Each structure stands twice: as structure tokens, then as C-alpha cells.
Amino acid sequence: KDKRYESSTQAGIDKQFNITIDKVPSQADAYILTFLLEGQVKRTIHNVYVGDVFIAAGQSNMELNYADYYEQPDSFDSNVRDMFTKSDLPSFVDDDNIRFLVVDHKIGSSALPLKSFNSAQWLPANESNAKKLGYLPQLFAEQLRLHHPNIPIGIIQTAWGGTDIARHLRDGDIYANHIAPLDGYNVAGILWYQGENDAAEQEPALQYEANFSTLINQYREVLGDSDLPFLYVQLARYTGYAYTPIVRQAQFSVLHSAAVNTTRNLAMTVSMDTDKGTAKIIHPLGKEILAKRMADQWLAIEGQTTIPSGPQASSAEPVDGDASTVSVSFNTGTAHGLQALEPNRTLRATTSTLTSSTDLPLQGF
């Protein structure tokens, strides 16, 4: 606990410097960072944590938090539309070893524009602050902390509700002000939930696969890791936008796209069965279920084991010309031990009660 870790460097003409301290282990307790010049202490920073940092990017289903979307009666009514009550929302995390920064909805500055409550420091995701952080990233962090209690988790939330993917690409204003300032920053992975805006019109929906492949390459490039873990959510069942199926298929296709420089450490979380019966609203419930699935994928990547995935159908063909009987083929390794299950689309659904066995025939093909 009292061990010292040291390193030295030299500032440039502009008085800026970078320094790397090797092999500092993660721990639940904070470190103290001390800067010395010619043997004299110049600055001391307390409460420094070493752990895994994730970028939470995309649009409103990643940004979705209590303070902005549910706390005030007007915002609650517009987002819920009588589908559920506040008691149905997930519980906040309460963990000082989950820290977060929320990037503000501002453009035009080269510096990362943080929300005013983050202007001076990372905030702990405790009872006082967690309502300001998106449900999905905080619940993802909570899952990781359950598995690794000695590793603090940091979240940099860059998500911006109501935005199309073009604004998140290198030529877009969100990229310029929310992602480019992180150039060279060492992160453990990227969490992405976006695509609703692009599903509203045909042209952006048809371009989504190409744009999303480009985005994955660009984010990995700016962060200096060609196979940086990139975990994303496939769009949910919401039917308010005509081209949602096209975007959803594009998100599936990217898993095996030649346009992605490497599909290693790329993982898609299915959300079709997680909404607890709230598919009529664009911000469905079930973020804790998505968080568990994404955390399982990250832990598999970390452990270099097979990334969990739902069955991935590759083709469907009539049997002997009979359209009433179809033979479905699946990508290798994604369909072992298949059985028909019925989704639990009630407000009481949990990660452990999400499905039940059924003898009903398969539907929806």
C-alpha cells in the first residue's frame, strides 16, 4: 500500500509533458501523485485511482440518466408515456470506485467541454451523483466491479441524444469536440448505443453499415489501439422509425465486415428481448440487462475467451421447395444447444427471469 512508483521526463519548449509510470497496480484505495522539480515538491494530487476507463458514446439510450430524462414531471411524462412508473427504473449504483465525467452538449472548442458538475474533478457514482450518469454505463461499471472489486472503473460519457452517426465521424462536430480531445488517451474500451436517428430516413439507414465501420476504425485510431474492445447495442424493438430493420441489419453485418480494419474484440449486444414490454417508447427499460450482457462480453475479451453472442443466422432456405418449412443456418459457434424460449416482456423481468421454456411454434420469419 505504501510502495512508491517513480518516473521522470523533461518538459518541451511549450512547457508541456507526458509521463508514463509503469506497472502501477489497480487497487480500491487511492494513490497520491506528487510532482517534483529538481527535488522540490511542486504539486501534490490526492485521490488518484488506477483502473479501467471506458468511453460511453452514441445518443440518448446511452446518455439516458435520471436527472435529465426522468426527474422533472414534464421530462418523465414525455419519455415514459404511461408505460411505467419511477419505481420501475433501475436503482442507481452507489460506489465511490466508479468515477465519471460527462461531456457537455457544446461544440467549437478544442478542449473537452465537461458538464459544470464535472468542471473540477471526476465524480464518484454514489447516491448523490449517480443520477447524472447514464443508466447503461453506470450499470455496466457495476457489473465489472462485482467481478473485480479491486479495480476502479472510470466512465467518460460523450453520448449526445438525438444525433445521427455522421456527427460522430471524424468530419463531424461531435467527433471534433468530444473524441478528438481524447487523442492518445489510454482506455479499456468503447461502449456504443446509437442508430435511432439514422433509422428515421432511408438514405442514412442505407449508409449506416459503411458509416459505422468507418467510425469503429476512426475511434480505435485516435485512441491508439487497432483492436480496442468496441461493445455496441443493436437497436431495440421500437417501431417509430420506418428503417430500424435496415439499421439493425447493418449493425449485425458490421460484426463480419471487411470494412472494419479488424473485427477482433468487436461485440454486439442484442436488445430485442430486453425491453420489459416497453417497446412503444424510444427509451425502453432493460438497461440493467444490456449492461450485464455487455459486461459479460468485456470480461470474455479480457480473459481471451469466446465472446458471448446470441444465435447469428447466416441464411434461411425452404426445404425441398416447401416455403412452409425453412432450414436456418447459423454462423459457426453461435448456435450450440438452441432451444425455443419465450421472452418475458413484463416490467418484472430480470436478467435471471428474462425467458422461459415454451412449446409454442417459432414465429416471425
Please identify what each model-predicted range represents.
Residues 1-365:
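Cell-envelope and extracellular/periplasmic
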